[in-house]
Swiss-Prot record:
Disulfide bonds: none annotated. Belongs to the UPF0637 family. InterPro entries: UPF0637 (IPR009403), UPF0637_domain_sf (IPR053707). It comes from the Bacteria. It holds the Pfam family DUF1054. This is UPF0637 protein BC_3960. It comes from Bacillus cereus (strain ATCC 14579 / DSM 31 / CCUG 7414 / JCM 2152 / NBRC 15305 / NCIMB 9373 / NCTC 2599 / NRRL B-3711).
Amino acid sequence: MTIQTFKSTDFDVFTVDGLEERMSAIKTNIHPKLEALGEQFAEYLSKQTDENFFYHVAKHARRKVNPPNDTWVAFSTNKRGYKMLPHFQIGLWGTHAFIYFGLIYECPQKVETAHAFLEHLNDLKTNIPNDFVWSIDHTKPSVKLHKTLETEDLQKMIERLATVKKAELLVGIHISPEEFSAMTNEQFLAKIESTMQSLLPLYALCNR
């Protein structure tokens, strides 16, 4: 089955005014694609890890006034949710698509994971591809490009994950609407797969 992935025009959904109107546009235009990606890559991650992965499409159910500025599908080994676990994400902001692995503030494994990352700090600095980015807040689009970080910068972000209650750490790639215009469905799916391959060693560190 051929999955219809994102188009460059899908980013325009975040220009729709109003909570109900934007949510309707997201549910109509974006969620079916996230569902399809969820099915495919939950199976992919399950095969790669020998664990059962489940996908979770963001519902934005807590929003009562402000419309969402991003949306995503997340992958975890818990059928009921993902926020409490290290997890993968595929999603969209108005400015870019993203493919991430990370831990957000609800995850109780942050301290143990930070210690594991620090033990392999030099490996992370060397093995994470230069064009990958790091986020310390999943609710904001701003990131730090891996190739611009010194080892000490990476160390500080990881240490913060262990010491700050609301700290988060995600890593992966961004794809701009312009890049999407030049990509086929097959190229995008291959990009997701190669990105997840690069991130799976971090997942392994979380579960050693």
